[in-house]
A protein has these predicted regions:
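Acidic, glycine/polar-enriched metal-coordinating patches/loops
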Residues: 161-163
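Acidic glycine-/aspartate-rich tracts in secreted/extracellular proteins
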Residues: 69-71, 111-114, 154-158
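Glycine-centric low-complexity/flexibility signal
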Residues: 1-106, 121-150, 166-178
Length: 178
């Protein structure tokens, strides 16, 4: 969890403007570096009393790549290295679970040779919280915090995209927009 996770939804028939649901996990940005990384935290389960709440999403894992060179050739479109957190499932008439946080990716590569026809996407995004999708629903799940991508030797300069984004919180009470 590079950044904090999002808070859960307002809850059943709550008109308060602020969240009254579960709190998101703490961000670990001050503690993450090439020699200290963390798995993404799992999301909390939704509150339920009607047996239709959903579980929280799994957190992203840890990927460590050590290589002299990474090369792509040909027309592959895109290759992906992913430690994304899992989205939470949508809930019925109970609370939706929170999403998993993105994990950590450490890449120690001396040389990059990435073809424009075979780009690389490196991502450690938080998952999206579940939606409470009935009018009497309790509350949406919080979004997962962003993960971390660390290039500890040479960072790629072309044809590589790096993503570390927070996940979105789920909608409350079937609201639109959230």
């Amino acid at each position: 969890n590079y950044s904090a996770g999002g808070n859960g939804g307002r809850g059943w028939n709550c008109t308060a403007p602020n969240s009254a649901g579960g709190l998101g996990g703490i961000g670990l940005s001050a503690h993450i570096g090439a020699s200290r990384i963390f798995m993404g935290g799992g999301g909390g389960g939704g509150e339920g009393n009607n047996a239709v709440a959903t579980d929280g999403g799994r957190g992203g894992g840890i990927i460590i790549i050590r290589a002299n060179e990474i090369v792509t050739t040909g027309s592959c479109g895109q290759r992906t290295i992913s430690a994304n957190g899992q989205n939470s499932s949508n809930a019925g008439n109970d609370g939706a679970g929170g999403a998993g946080a993105g994990g950590s990716i450490v890449i120690q590569v001396n040389s990059w040779n990435i073809a424009a026809t075979c780009e690389v996407l490196v991502r450690a995004n938080g998952g999206n919280g579940g939606i409470s999708n009935t009018g009497n629903a309790h509350g949406g799940g919080g979004g997962g915090g962003q993960g971390a991508v660390i290039y500890s030797i040479t960072q790629p300069t072309t044809n590589t995209t790096t993503q570390t984004q927070n996940g979105n919180g789920g909608c409350d009470n079937n609201s639109s927009p959230c």
